[in-house]
Amino acid sequence: MKRTRGIDRREFLKFVGAAGALSLPVFRHSMGFAAQWPAKPIRLSIGYAVGGGTDIFCRGFAQAMEGPLRATIEAGNMPGSVAAIATDFVLKRPADGYSWLGTSNFNKFLRPMGYHKGVPWKDWQWFPVAGTYMGWGVKPDSPFKTFHDVLEATKKRPVTVSHSGVGGIWHEGDGILAKAAGVQFSYIPYKGGAPAVLAALQGEVEVASCGVHEQIEFLRAGKLRNLAVFENEPMTVEGMTFEPITKYVPQVKPYTPFSGDISIGVRREAPVEILKAIYQAYLKAYESPRYAEILKQNVGYKVISNPLESDKKAAFRECVTASIFKELGIAKIDPSELGLPRPEEFEKWWPPKDYKPRLT
């Protein structure tokens, strides 16, 4: 499946932000420090475990950027606290364009969960690299034949569900689902979607809740069975048809499609010439046939946005999640304490007085 997203009124009302496909002309400056950049390898610190969606797409996209940048990009994983550890590490590095962050959903979870005080749309220049789908999977011999069976089981006991971290994207989706269905799950957090899938395969939990891209190799091999995807219509991938969650919980329709974004972030204080060079390489990387194949193989889709769109999307995503987490009782910090409006008031609020675009 291919999908390209853009922020519009329909998705705003669904509390789901996205990015369009606009681009800005960018030219590399020939004078000053940026003219010699990059003069050494760039380090990409990925905030989730090896093998998960953030890892796969960030590594793949970084490889596609090496040619346009004429640089070597060295990727390493620093999982924990839904990328807060990697975020803190990169923010403490010099803002010289040599330290990048690989994360998901523009770090929208960190402030509402009290993991980090940094403001995503003030600290980072974001470069979205992929969009992903949410799904639930079980071992082939699981007694849960459909998602209806899971819901029925929760009437007797909380079903154990793995996800990529407390306060992360899949935890958010599970919270929305649980509240709409009036059930409770017993959540077991892991440091990424890949470990969350392995937990189900090894019998540590009953259901894996994560991205379809993190399940796909096991679905292909028949080692995992999909129960549903967070969509409003059936989804077909390589001849496999996945049922929409609305078939079992119609109340979540306003939140569909519920999905995640994978992004690379660069310190916003980096020289503008360097940020422009990175953005130019970003646009070129999306033309890579190799990266297109990575998207296809891992059930991802393109999410291209220009710098101004990315700033707005990062703020909107944080605003929506802070509101949802408060409603679900997950938030550690109230949205009002973060200076965030209610989602329905976002368009009037944006841009706030202290917002300063870095690239225009």
Predicted segments, located by residue:
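N-terminal (or domain-start) structured segment
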Residues: 33-122, 170, 183-209, 218, ...
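Ligand-binding pocket segment of bilobal, Venus flytrap-like solute-binding proteins
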Residues: 162-244
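Secondary-structure end/capping motifs
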Residues: 265-330
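C-terminal lobe and pocket-closing loops
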Residues: 215-293, 338-360
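Hinge/capping helix and adjacent helix->loop/strand transition within the periplasmic-binding protein
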Residues: 65, 89-98, 111-195, 261-294
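N-terminal secretory signal peptides
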Residues: 1-11, 15-20, 33
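Short, flexible turn/loop "capping" segments at secondary-structure junctions
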Residues: 37-39, 127-131, 254-259
